[in-house]
A protein has these predicted regions:
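N-terminal pre-domain/capping segments
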Residues: 1-63, 67
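Well-ordered, non-membrane alpha-helical segments in soluble/globular domains
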Residues: 3-11, 46-53, 88-93, 125-132, ...
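Short helix-terminating capping/connector loops at secondary-structure junctions
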Residues: 18-20, 61-62, 103-107, 203-210, ...
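Hydrophobic faces of well-ordered beta-strands that scaffold small-molecule active sites
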Residues: 23-27, 67-71, 108-112, 141-146, ...
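Active-site beta-loop-alpha junctions enriched in small/polar residues
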Residues: 30-32, 72-76, 113-117, 146-150, ...
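Active-site acidic/histidine proton-transfer and metal-coordination neighborhood
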Residues: 45-163
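Acidic/histidine-rich catalytic cores of soluble enzymes
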Residues: 125-207, 211
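Histidine-acidic metal/acid-base catalytic patches
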Residues: 166, 177-291
Length: 291
Protein backbone atom coordinates (compact mmCIF):
# COMPACT_ATOMS: atom_id res chain seq x y z
CA UNK A 1 0.00 0.00 0.00
CA UNK A 2 1.40 3.38 -1.05
CA UNK A 3 0.10 5.15 2.05
CA UNK A 4 1.77 2.62 4.33
CA UNK A 5 5.05 3.05 2.46
CA UNK A 6 4.72 6.83 2.75
CA UNK A 7 4.32 6.64 6.52
CA UNK A 8 7.24 4.21 6.78
CA UNK A 9 9.43 6.57 4.75
CA UNK A 10 8.26 9.51 6.84
CA UNK A 11 9.55 7.73 9.92
CA UNK A 12 12.88 7.19 8.15
CA UNK A 13 13.04 10.91 7.35
CA UNK A 14 12.34 11.82 10.96
CA UNK A 15 15.20 9.57 12.09
CA UNK A 16 17.46 11.34 9.58
CA UNK A 17 16.32 14.69 10.97
CA UNK A 18 17.00 13.74 14.57
CA UNK A 19 20.44 12.49 13.56
CA UNK A 20 21.13 15.95 12.15
CA UNK A 21 19.56 17.96 15.01
CA UNK A 22 16.57 19.04 12.87
CA UNK A 23 13.63 19.61 15.21
CA UNK A 24 11.10 21.12 12.77
CA UNK A 25 9.46 19.16 9.96
CA UNK A 26 6.58 19.59 7.53
CA UNK A 27 4.75 16.38 6.64
CA UNK A 28 3.68 15.86 3.05
CA UNK A 29 -0.04 16.41 2.57
CA UNK A 30 0.05 13.49 0.12
CA UNK A 31 0.76 10.84 2.76
CA UNK A 32 -2.53 9.15 1.87
CA UNK A 33 -3.23 9.55 -1.86
CA UNK A 34 -6.87 10.32 -2.72
CA UNK A 35 -7.83 10.21 0.96
CA UNK A 36 -10.59 12.80 0.54
CA UNK A 37 -11.84 11.55 -2.83
CA UNK A 38 -15.57 10.87 -2.73
CA UNK A 39 -15.12 7.43 -4.30
CA UNK A 40 -13.19 6.38 -1.16
CA UNK A 41 -15.69 7.78 1.33
CA UNK A 42 -16.37 4.33 2.79
CA UNK A 43 -12.66 3.75 3.59
CA UNK A 44 -11.24 4.77 6.96
CA UNK A 45 -7.50 5.24 6.31
CA UNK A 46 -6.80 6.33 9.88
CA UNK A 47 -7.96 3.01 11.27
CA UNK A 48 -6.51 0.97 8.38
CA UNK A 49 -3.12 2.63 8.96
CA UNK A 50 -3.44 2.90 12.72
CA UNK A 51 -0.08 1.28 13.53
CA UNK A 52 2.16 3.26 11.12
CA UNK A 53 0.42 6.51 12.08
CA UNK A 54 0.98 5.71 15.74
CA UNK A 55 4.65 4.87 15.10
CA UNK A 56 5.23 8.27 13.48
CA UNK A 57 3.46 10.07 16.31
CA UNK A 58 5.37 8.13 18.95
CA UNK A 59 8.69 9.13 17.40
CA UNK A 60 7.64 12.78 17.16
CA UNK A 61 6.69 12.85 20.84
CA UNK A 62 9.75 10.93 22.03
CA UNK A 63 12.08 13.44 20.35
CA UNK A 64 10.08 16.61 20.95
CA UNK A 65 9.77 17.39 17.25
CA UNK A 66 7.59 20.28 16.06
CA UNK A 67 5.64 19.17 13.02
CA UNK A 68 3.06 20.62 10.68
CA UNK A 69 1.17 20.18 7.43
CA UNK A 70 0.74 22.73 4.64
CA UNK A 71 -2.55 21.68 2.98
CA UNK A 72 -2.52 22.07 -0.78
CA UNK A 73 -3.42 25.26 -2.64
CA UNK A 74 -6.94 24.01 -3.39
CA UNK A 75 -7.80 24.31 0.32
CA UNK A 76 -9.31 27.80 0.04
CA UNK A 77 -11.51 29.35 2.71
CA UNK A 78 -11.99 32.67 0.89
CA UNK A 79 -13.84 30.98 -1.97
CA UNK A 80 -17.30 32.20 -3.04
CA UNK A 81 -18.20 28.68 -4.23
CA UNK A 82 -19.98 26.47 -1.66
CA UNK A 83 -18.67 23.26 -3.20
CA UNK A 84 -15.06 24.48 -2.97
CA UNK A 85 -15.60 25.53 0.64
CA UNK A 86 -17.05 22.10 1.43
CA UNK A 87 -14.06 20.39 -0.19
CA UNK A 88 -11.65 22.69 1.67
CA UNK A 89 -13.20 21.90 5.03
CA UNK A 90 -13.12 18.20 4.20
CA UNK A 91 -9.40 18.52 3.46
CA UNK A 92 -8.75 20.35 6.74
CA UNK A 93 -10.66 17.65 8.60
CA UNK A 94 -8.45 15.07 6.89
CA UNK A 95 -5.29 16.80 8.05
CA UNK A 96 -6.61 17.06 11.60
CA UNK A 97 -7.54 13.38 11.47
CA UNK A 98 -3.99 12.46 10.45
CA UNK A 99 -2.60 14.35 13.44
CA UNK A 100 -5.16 12.65 15.66
CA UNK A 101 -4.16 9.25 14.25
CA UNK A 102 -0.57 10.08 15.20
CA UNK A 103 -1.71 10.92 18.72
CA UNK A 104 -0.36 14.47 18.40
CA UNK A 105 -1.92 17.37 20.27
CA UNK A 106 -2.80 20.79 18.86
CA UNK A 107 0.81 21.96 18.82
CA UNK A 108 0.91 20.20 15.44
CA UNK A 109 -0.48 22.84 13.07
CA UNK A 110 -1.99 23.11 9.59
CA UNK A 111 -0.64 26.16 7.76
CA UNK A 112 -2.78 27.73 5.02
CA UNK A 113 -2.93 30.87 2.90
CA UNK A 114 -5.96 33.15 2.96
CA UNK A 115 -6.65 32.36 -0.68
CA UNK A 116 -7.89 34.22 -3.73
CA UNK A 117 -9.35 37.72 -3.93
CA UNK A 118 -11.88 36.85 -6.68
CA UNK A 119 -11.92 40.44 -7.94
CA UNK A 120 -12.89 41.91 -4.57
CA UNK A 121 -10.25 41.45 -1.88
CA UNK A 122 -12.17 43.09 1.02
CA UNK A 123 -15.17 40.84 0.38
CA UNK A 124 -12.95 37.77 0.03
CA UNK A 125 -11.21 38.62 3.30
CA UNK A 126 -14.54 39.05 5.08
CA UNK A 127 -15.75 35.75 3.65
CA UNK A 128 -12.55 34.04 4.83
CA UNK A 129 -13.03 35.47 8.31
CA UNK A 130 -16.65 34.29 8.43
CA UNK A 131 -15.80 30.80 7.17
CA UNK A 132 -12.92 30.36 9.63
CA UNK A 133 -15.06 31.55 12.54
CA UNK A 134 -17.61 28.85 11.69
CA UNK A 135 -15.06 26.00 11.70
CA UNK A 136 -15.09 23.40 14.48
CA UNK A 137 -12.73 24.11 17.36
CA UNK A 138 -10.70 20.98 16.57
CA UNK A 139 -9.76 22.58 13.24
CA UNK A 140 -9.26 26.15 14.47
CA UNK A 141 -6.86 25.20 17.24
CA UNK A 142 -4.53 23.62 14.67
CA UNK A 143 -4.53 26.50 12.15
CA UNK A 144 -1.86 29.01 11.21
CA UNK A 145 -2.18 31.59 8.40
CA UNK A 146 0.66 32.60 6.08
CA UNK A 147 1.02 35.70 3.93
CA UNK A 148 1.29 34.89 0.24
CA UNK A 149 3.36 36.30 -2.59
CA UNK A 150 0.62 37.72 -4.82
CA UNK A 151 -2.69 38.34 -3.07
CA UNK A 152 -3.06 38.66 0.71
CA UNK A 153 0.08 40.38 1.94
CA UNK A 154 1.55 40.34 5.44
CA UNK A 155 -0.45 43.27 6.92
CA UNK A 156 -3.71 41.89 5.51
CA UNK A 157 -2.99 38.37 6.75
CA UNK A 158 -1.98 39.74 10.14
CA UNK A 159 -5.27 41.63 10.49
CA UNK A 160 -7.18 38.39 9.90
CA UNK A 161 -4.98 36.52 12.37
CA UNK A 162 -5.63 39.17 15.01
CA UNK A 163 -9.37 39.16 14.36
CA UNK A 164 -9.59 35.36 14.60
CA UNK A 165 -6.90 34.79 17.30
CA UNK A 166 -5.03 32.48 14.92
CA UNK A 167 -1.19 32.56 14.85
CA UNK A 168 0.55 33.98 11.79
CA UNK A 169 3.45 32.34 9.97
CA UNK A 170 5.45 35.17 8.44
CA UNK A 171 7.02 34.27 5.10
CA UNK A 172 9.80 36.82 4.76
CA UNK A 173 10.33 36.04 1.06
CA UNK A 174 6.64 36.53 0.29
CA UNK A 175 6.69 39.76 2.27
CA UNK A 176 9.61 40.99 0.19
CA UNK A 177 7.71 40.53 -3.11
CA UNK A 178 4.23 41.50 -1.81
CA UNK A 179 4.10 44.36 0.67
CA UNK A 180 2.73 47.83 1.41
CA UNK A 181 6.08 49.45 2.20
CA UNK A 182 6.42 47.93 5.67
CA UNK A 183 9.41 45.92 6.85
CA UNK A 184 8.92 42.48 8.40
CA UNK A 185 10.58 43.68 11.60
CA UNK A 186 7.96 46.43 11.93
CA UNK A 187 5.19 43.83 11.87
CA UNK A 188 6.94 41.37 14.15
CA UNK A 189 5.67 42.57 17.58
CA UNK A 190 2.08 42.12 16.40
CA UNK A 191 2.87 38.79 14.74
CA UNK A 192 4.55 37.59 17.91
CA UNK A 193 1.40 38.46 19.88
CA UNK A 194 -0.67 36.14 17.65
CA UNK A 195 1.41 33.26 19.01
CA UNK A 196 0.23 33.96 22.54
CA UNK A 197 -3.46 33.24 21.96
CA UNK A 198 -5.29 30.15 23.27
CA UNK A 199 -5.53 28.74 19.74
CA UNK A 200 -1.82 29.24 19.14
CA UNK A 201 -0.83 27.57 22.40
CA UNK A 202 -3.48 24.83 22.47
CA UNK A 203 -1.79 21.69 23.77
CA UNK A 204 1.35 23.52 24.93
CA UNK A 205 2.57 23.21 28.54
CA UNK A 206 2.66 26.56 30.33
CA UNK A 207 6.41 26.22 30.88
CA UNK A 208 7.17 25.25 27.26
CA UNK A 209 5.12 27.37 24.84
CA UNK A 210 5.11 26.63 21.13
CA UNK A 211 7.55 29.07 19.47
CA UNK A 212 6.46 31.26 16.56
CA UNK A 213 7.37 30.08 13.09
CA UNK A 214 8.58 31.87 9.98
CA UNK A 215 9.27 30.71 6.45
CA UNK A 216 12.54 31.66 4.78
CA UNK A 217 13.62 31.27 1.18
CA UNK A 218 15.54 33.19 -1.46
CA UNK A 219 14.46 34.32 -4.94
CA UNK A 220 15.21 31.87 -7.71
CA UNK A 221 16.46 34.60 -10.06
CA UNK A 222 16.01 38.25 -11.02
CA UNK A 223 13.52 37.16 -13.67
CA UNK A 224 11.67 34.88 -11.23
CA UNK A 225 11.76 36.67 -7.86
CA UNK A 226 8.84 34.66 -6.48
CA UNK A 227 10.37 31.26 -7.22
CA UNK A 228 12.44 29.44 -4.60
CA UNK A 229 16.19 29.10 -5.09
CA UNK A 230 18.17 25.95 -4.32
CA UNK A 231 19.73 27.60 -1.25
CA UNK A 232 18.85 30.30 1.27
CA UNK A 233 21.05 33.40 1.24
CA UNK A 234 22.25 33.93 4.78
CA UNK A 235 22.41 37.72 5.17
CA UNK A 236 18.73 38.69 4.66
CA UNK A 237 17.66 35.98 7.10
CA UNK A 238 20.37 36.86 9.59
CA UNK A 239 19.47 40.56 9.46
CA UNK A 240 15.83 39.74 10.17
CA UNK A 241 16.70 37.42 13.05
CA UNK A 242 18.93 40.09 14.56
CA UNK A 243 16.11 42.62 14.30
CA UNK A 244 13.66 40.44 16.25
CA UNK A 245 16.13 38.95 18.75
CA UNK A 246 15.56 41.59 21.48
CA UNK A 247 11.90 40.56 21.87
CA UNK A 248 11.99 36.91 20.73
CA UNK A 249 13.17 34.02 22.89
CA UNK A 250 12.78 31.35 20.21
CA UNK A 251 11.59 31.11 16.63
CA UNK A 252 11.30 28.13 14.30
CA UNK A 253 12.59 28.80 10.78
CA UNK A 254 11.12 26.60 8.06
CA UNK A 255 13.35 26.70 5.00
CA UNK A 256 11.64 26.49 1.61
CA UNK A 257 14.54 25.69 -0.70
CA UNK A 258 14.85 23.24 -3.56
CA UNK A 259 17.79 21.42 -1.96
CA UNK A 260 15.82 20.89 1.28
CA UNK A 261 18.17 19.62 4.02
CA UNK A 262 21.14 20.32 1.78
CA UNK A 263 20.13 23.98 1.87
CA UNK A 264 19.96 23.82 5.67
CA UNK A 265 23.45 22.33 5.98
CA UNK A 266 24.84 24.98 3.64
CA UNK A 267 23.05 27.73 5.58
CA UNK A 268 24.52 26.48 8.86
CA UNK A 269 27.99 26.62 7.31
CA UNK A 270 27.29 30.20 6.26
CA UNK A 271 25.98 31.06 9.73
CA UNK A 272 29.18 29.72 11.28
CA UNK A 273 31.13 32.41 9.44
CA UNK A 274 29.40 35.02 11.61
CA UNK A 275 30.35 33.57 15.00
CA UNK A 276 32.44 36.65 15.74
CA UNK A 277 29.43 38.82 14.89
CA UNK A 278 26.97 37.51 17.44
CA UNK A 279 26.00 34.14 15.98
CA UNK A 280 26.39 31.11 18.25
CA UNK A 281 26.07 27.64 16.72
CA UNK A 282 24.07 25.47 19.13
CA UNK A 283 23.93 22.25 17.11
CA UNK A 284 23.61 21.07 13.53
CA UNK A 285 20.42 23.02 12.87
CA UNK A 286 20.07 25.69 15.58
CA UNK A 287 21.69 29.03 16.29
CA UNK A 288 21.49 31.71 18.95
CA UNK A 289 21.49 35.28 17.62
CA UNK A 290 22.67 38.17 19.74
CA UNK A 291 20.88 41.45 18.96
Amino acid sequence: MIAGDNLHNTLRLLRHNVGNDIQVYRFSSKLIPLATHESLSDWNPYEALREPFAAVGKYVKEHGLRVSFHPDHFTVLSTPRPEVLKSSIRDLNHHVAMFDAMGLDARAKNNIHVGGAYGDKPTAGARFRENVAALPERIKQRLTFENDDKTFNAPETLELCEALSIPMVLDIHHQWVNHEGETPAELWPRILATWQTPYAQAGSPADDPLPPKIHASSPKSASDPRGHADHVIVLPLLEFLRSIAPITDRVDVMLEAKLKDGALFALMEDMARYQEDGVEILDGASVRIKP
